[in-house]
Swiss-Prot record:
<keyword id="KW-0732">Signal</keyword>
<feature type="signal peptide">
    <location>
        <begin position="1"/>
        <end position="19"/>
    </location>
</feature>
<dbReference type="InterPro" id="IPR036264">
    <property type="entry name" value="Bact_exopeptidase_dim_dom"/>
</dbReference>
<dbReference type="InterPro" id="IPR002933">
    <property type="entry name" value="Peptidase_M20"/>
</dbReference>
<dbReference type="InterPro" id="IPR011650">
    <property type="entry name" value="Peptidase_M20_dimer"/>
</dbReference>
<dbReference type="InterPro" id="IPR044757">
    <property type="entry name" value="ILR1-like_Hyd"/>
</dbReference>
<comment type="function">
    <text>Hydrolyzes certain amino acid conjugates of the plant growth regulator indole-3-acetic acid (IAA).</text>
</comment>
<dbReference type="GO" id="GO:0016787">
    <property type="term" value="F:hydrolase activity"/>
</dbReference>
<comment type="similarity">
    <text>Belongs to the peptidase M20 family.</text>
</comment>
<dbReference type="Pfam" id="PF01546">
    <property type="entry name" value="Peptidase_M20"/>
</dbReference>
<dbReference type="GO" id="GO:0009850">
    <property type="term" value="P:auxin metabolic process"/>
</dbReference>
<protein>
    <recommendedName>
        <fullName>IAA-amino acid hydrolase ILR1-like 5</fullName>
        <ecNumber>3.5.1.-</ecNumber>
    </recommendedName>
</protein>
<keyword id="KW-0378">Hydrolase</keyword>
<dbReference type="Pfam" id="PF07687">
    <property type="entry name" value="M20_dimer"/>
</dbReference>
<dbReference type="InterPro" id="IPR017439">
    <property type="entry name" value="Amidohydrolase"/>
</dbReference>
Length: 426
C-alpha cells in the first residue's frame, strides 16, 4: 500500500506545482503586455465619452479585438461583444463598462482628459483596458479554452442602464455565468474583495411636487402654503427608514434638493424636491417607492395641497440590486488565492451604490467584485467620481490576468464535471 500512496502524494504535489507554475506564467505574460494595456487605457482616458456616446472608445475596442483575430460585433449602440475559444458551450461572460462622467478632471498629467467637463472618474477606462488585455491573453491560449469566453464591452453604466440594452441585443444568449470587476480605491493595488449575496443597492431617483396657492405673504389665510406642506412631507419621509423598515435591512432615502419661490413677500405656488431611494433588495426598493408616494400625497392633502411623485425612468432608470451567486463567489476567491496569493483576497463589503451589472444577474448567475488600486506613492487615493481620481496602473495587467483565470478555470471545472457525469447548477 505504501507505494500507491507515495505515487498519489507525488502526483498531487506535481499537480499543485504545475498549477502554480501556470498561474505565475499567466501573471508574467500579462506583465509583458503591461505597456500595451496601459497605452490603451491612456488613449481612452484622454478621450472620455459619456453614456451612449462612446463612439471613439467603441471603435478603439473593435480595432484592438480585430487585431487579435477576434470578430467584434456592435451591440446596444456603442457596445461591443466578441467571443474567444471553441465557439461551443459552455459560455462564460466577462464584462467591462466604457462610459465616462460629466466631471472636470483636476489631475495634471500627460494623459489628462482632452474633453472639457468629461472625465473617466470611475475607472471604466481601466476596466476596458483590463478586458482587452484578457482578450489578448485568452486569444493566445484559445486552444486550451474548454468552451467559449464572451467579452462584453458595455456602454452607459453611469445611469443609462446600458446592461439592459446589451441584454436586449442578445449578449447573454447561451451564457451560464458572468463576472465583472470594479476598481476600488479603498484597497491596496491588486487586492480583491468579494461578497456573496446582496452586495450593492437597488437604486432609483425621484422627483416630487407640492402644489399650493400663491398669494401675498401678509394674507396667509388666503393662500395655500406649499412650503409648510413640503416641510412636513420631507420630515415624514425620514420616518419610513427609522420607523417602518427593519433595522437590520439597509435602505436609504435622501432628499438632495428643494427649490421653489423667488420673491421675499409672496407664498410660492409650488415647491419641488427630489433625491434617491436605495435598498439592498429590489423588493425593498419597490416597497419604499410605494410608501413615498403615499406619504407625499397624504401629507400634502393634510395641508390642502396636491402632492405628486414621479419615479424617474428615462434619464435615470431604476437599477435592481446586485446579488452575487454563492458558488461563483467561491470561485472568485479560489482563483484569486491561486493567482494572487491568499493575502490578496479579502471579504467584501455591502455598499449602497448602484451598479447595472445587476441586470445581467437577473438572468444568469454572476459576481461583481472589487480590485484595489490604492497607492499613495502615485496619488491613487481618491474616491470615484472625484475630479482628482487617479489610478495606479499596475492594476491593469493584474486585472487582465484575473479575468483570464476566472474564465479559463470556470470552463475547465465545467468540462471536468461533464466528464464525470455530475450536474452543474447554481
Amino acid at each position: 500500500m505504501a507505494a500507491p500512496l507515495f505515487l498519489l502524494l507525488l502526483l498531487l504535489l506535481v499537480s499543485s506545482a504545475s498549477a502554480g507554475y501556470e498561474e505565475e506564467a499567466l501573471l508574467r505574460r500579462a506583465e509583458e503586455e503591461r505597456d500595451w494595456m496601459v497605452g490603451v487605457r491612456r488613449r481612452i482616458h484622454a478621450h472620455p465619452e459619456l453614456a451612449f456616446r462612446e463612439h471613439h472608445t467603441s471603435a478603439l475596442v473593435r480595432d484592438e479585438l480585430e487585431r487579435l483575430g477576434l470578430t467584434a460585433r456592435a451591440v446596444a449602440g456603442t457596445g461591443v461583444v466578441a467571443d474567444v475559444g471553441s465557439g461551443l458551450p459552455p459560455v462564460v461572460a466577462l464584462r467591462a463598462d466604457m462610459d465616462a462622467l460629466p466631471v472636470q478632471e483636476l489631475v495634471e498629467w500627460e494623459h489628462k482628459s482632452k474633453v472639457d467637463g468629461v472625465m473617466h472618474a470611475c475607472g471604466h477606462d481601466v476596466h476596458t483596458a483590463m478586458l482587452l488585455g484578457a482578450a489578448k491573453l485568452l486569444s493566445e491560449r484559445k486552444e486550451q479554452i474548454k468552451g467559449t469566453v464572451r467579452l462584453l464591452f458595455q456602454p452607459a453604466e453611469e445611469g443609462g442602464a446600458g446592461a439592459s440594452y446589451m441584454i436586449k441585443d442578445g449578449v447573454l444568449d447561451g451564457v451560464e455565468a458572468i463576472f465583472g470587476m470594479h476598481v476600488d480605491y479603498r484597497m491596496p493595488t491588486g487586492v480583491i474583495a468579494a461578497h456573496a449575496g446582496p452586495t450593492q443597492a437597488a437604486v432609483c431617483f425621484y422627483e416630487a411636487k407640492i402644489e399650493g396657492k400663491t398669494g401675498k405673504a401678509e394674507t396667509p389665510h388666503l393662500n395655500v402654503d406649499p412650503i409648510v406642506a413640503a416641510s412636513f412631507v420631507i420630515l415624514s419621509l425620514q420616518q419610513l427608514i427609522s420607523r417602518e423598515d427593519d433595522p437590520l435591512h439597509s435602505q436609504v432615502l435622501s432628499v438632495t434638493y428643494v427649490k421653489g419661490g423667488n420673491t421675499i413677500d409672496a407664498t410660492p405656488p409650488v415647491i419641488e424636491f427630489g433625491g434617491t431611494l436605495r435598498s439592498l433588495t429590489t423588493e425593498g426598493l419597490y416597497r419604499l417607492q410605494k410608501r413615498v408616494k403615499e406619504v407625499v400625497e397624504g401629507q400634502a392633502a393634510v395641508h390642502r395641497c396636491k402632492g405628486v411623485v414621479q419615479i424617474k425612468r428615462d434619464d435615470y432608470p431604476m437599477y435592481p440590486a446586485v446579488f452575487n451567486d454563492e458558488k461563483l463567489h467561491h470561485h472568485v476567491e479560489t482563483v484569486g488565492r491561486r493567482l494572487l496569493g491568499p493575502d490578496k483576497v479579502k471579504p467584501g463589503e455591502k455598499i449602497m451604490a448602484g451598479e447595472d451589472f445587476a441586470f445581467y444577474q437577473q438572468l444568469v448567475p454572476g459576481v461583481m467584485f472589487g480590485i484595489g488600486i490604492r497607492n499613495g506613492e502615485v496619488g491613487s487615493v481618491h474616491t470615484v467620481h472625484n475630479p482628482k481620481f487617479f489610478v495606479d496602473e499596475d492594476v491593469i495587467p493584474i486585472g487582465a490576468a484575473l479575468h483570464t483565470a476566472l474564465a479559463e478555470m470556470y470552463l475547465t471545472e465545467r468540462s471536468t464535471e461533464g466528464e464525470d457525469g455530475s450536474q452543474h447548477s447554481h
